[in-house]
Amino acid sequence: MPTLLLSDIHGNIVALEAVLEHAAKEGYDRVVFLGDAVGYYPDGNAVVEKLRSLNARGVMGNHDAWLLTLDVLEAEGYVFDILRWQADRIEEENWAWLAELPWKIDEGSWLAIHGSPCDPLVYVDELEVAREAFGCTEARWAFHGHTHLAGAYTALDGPNGPWVRHRPFTEPSNHLKIGPKARVLVNPGSVGQPRDGLPQAGYAIWHEDKDELTAYRVEYDIAAVEERVRSAGFPAPLYQRLYQGR
């Protein structure tokens, strides 16, 4: 069953629609969402609406959780100003869908979480953190987001603990196949705000029956997002960073 993996969309409906158009040509049967539907860009409601229409299974991201708890958060800054703006525009059904997201999906052979399997708010962005993360799950395939960095950590058991290496996904198409004794921690990349120096939206399609995955990078109309950001009165760096992939 081909599984479409989406993460860190952050209200960027333009990027999401481009990804879905590309993914439809590749083919998929189900959608797993790795958190952060909202935040940063104006179309959080439309993003959640689209995820609901896809019958996506999803997990909670930190921005999703912040939006749901704004009434008790004592936080300032543009990140939270944007979330307050979005909260006023999220429809009731979409709010309810976000509120029901779990922090983790654990199916035994595979796991979905926003951050580390050890803690959904931890960034898996270093080898030592990844090594610890493998110790918190027995899943062969673990999927996460949060860092906005597309790539995979692969682990093999060694005499002094797991041997771990990292591979970034920087090509338009990045194929990954694992052996029977390997385990992986995969970040499909950010749909809405990549931070690895590449402006293209990231996503992946996983073939569980073949023990393989392909991660893709997709061009989209960043200028259209810039227009949406300007119209909403959000800070200019939010669209400027999209052109740089930072």
PLM features per residue range, with description:
Residues 1-56:
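N-terminal active-site segment of His-dependent metallophosphoesterases
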Residues 6-7, 31-36, 57-62, 113, ...:
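Active-site neighborhood of phospho(di)ester-bond hydrolases with catalytic His/Asp-centered motifs
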Residues 10-14, 39-41, 63-68, 106, ...:
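Active-site environment of divalent metal-dependent phosphoester hydrolases
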Residues 23-28, 107, 136-138, 179-180:
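Glycine-rich phosphate-binding loop signature in dinucleotide/nucleotide-binding domains
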Residues 47-48, 53-138:
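Active-site neighborhood of divalent metal-dependent phosphoester bond hydrolases
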Residues 136-160, 165-166:
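Hydrophobic, aromatic-enriched interface-forming segments
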Residues 157-246:
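Acidic, His/Gly-rich catalytic cores of divalent-metal-dependent hydrolytic chemistry
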